């Protein structure tokens, strides 16, 4: 499998490069970075103390011409450019970017009619198993329990709530037969009035170097149930992304997520 990494100089990009180098079935063939990155021209393994022979570049077409699959954990505007290049070169995509607009998501979905794409806000195996637990819990706590989702991330995260928190909200809302768009409450301030019992609340914390903590709270009278997932390292995201690459290698065009990759549907 010939793999390229987008955002190669970032925290997640470095973790992905290491995961590819440690996979005997994978070959690192490209490392993309921003056009204004000070690391352009450096070896992709520099941050790991290794030589890979692959230089960081901003030349999309040069990288996509060599790759079978691109792994992309960047930002929406970058990912949209990568989708266009992937369509030109018939390259598959594993996308962990979050913060897309509805229009961008529609473009991503349209692209999946021509190339294989795994798109998931969180590729950790633990998070995706947690989603199944939430579906089960929501069905049994559908009456008399208030549902709140609390997430915490590092100070550099630019979108809120996190994509993972929204995935959890979608899982709970779907299990209850609701649309998250109709019942989500994003933060509270001032005099809000009594809580709507059908709502799903979100609260976001940003600070320090928190990799990612997510708790879904089912608060009833006399008891509360908390289902929590905590990430202590980005390694789990990188390992999940590699599983997604392996999954796509045997598939054609289509839009998939980690539930498909892990056989949880």
Swiss-Prot record:
Binding site for NADP(+): 34
SUPFAM superfamilies per UniProt: Glyceraldehyde-3-phosphate dehydrogenase-like, C-terminal domain (SSF55347), NAD(P)-binding Rossmann-fold domains (SSF51735)
Origin superkingdom: Bacteria
PANTHER family: 4-HYDROXY-TETRAHYDRODIPICOLINATE REDUCTASE 1, CHLOROPLASTIC-RELATED, DIHYDRODIPICOLINATE REDUCTASE
Family, similarity comment: Belongs to the DapB family.
NCBIfam families with a match to the protein in the record: dapB
Function of the molecule: Catalyzes the conversion of 4-hydroxy-tetrahydrodipicolinate (HTPA) to tetrahydrodipicolinate.
The name this protein goes by in its record: 4-hydroxy-tetrahydrodipicolinate reductase
Organism: Burkholderia lata (strain ATCC 17760 / DSM 23089 / LMG 22485 / NCIMB 9086 / R18194 / 383)
Gene name per UniProt: dapB
């Amino acid at each position: 499998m010939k793999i390229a990494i987008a955002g190669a100089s970032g925290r997640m990009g470095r973790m992905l490069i290491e995961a590819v180098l440690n996979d005997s079935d994978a070959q690192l063939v490209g490392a993309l970075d921003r056009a204004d990155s000070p690391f352009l021209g450096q070896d992709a393994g520099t941050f790991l103390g290794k030589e890979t022979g692959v230089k960081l570049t901003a030349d999309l077409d040069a990288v996509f011409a060599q790759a079978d699959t691109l792994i992309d954990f960047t930002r929406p505007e970058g990912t949209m450019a990568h989708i266009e290049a992937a369509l030109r070169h018939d390259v598959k995509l594993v996308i962990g970017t979050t913060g897309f607009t509805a229009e961008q998501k529609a473009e991503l979905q349209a692209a999946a009619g021509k190339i294989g794409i795994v798109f998931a806000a969180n590729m950790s195996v633990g998070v995706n198993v947690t989603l199944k637990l939430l579906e089960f819990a929501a069905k049994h706590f559908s009456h008399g329990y208030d549902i709140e989702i609390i997430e915490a991330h590092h100070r550099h995260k630019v979108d809120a709530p996190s994509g993972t928190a929204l995935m959890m909200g979608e899982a709970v809302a779907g299990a209850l037969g609701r649309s998250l768009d109709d019942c989500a409450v994003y933060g509270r301030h001032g005099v809000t009035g009594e809580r709507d019992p059908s709502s799903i609340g979100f609260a976001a914390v940003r600070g320090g170097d928190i990799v990612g903590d997510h708790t879904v709270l089912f608060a009833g009278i006399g008891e509360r149930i908390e289902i929590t997932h905590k990430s202590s390292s980005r390694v789990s995201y990188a390992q999940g992304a590699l599983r997604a690459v392996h999954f796509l290698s045997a598939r054609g065009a289509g839009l998939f997520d980690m539930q498909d990759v892990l056989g949880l549907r």
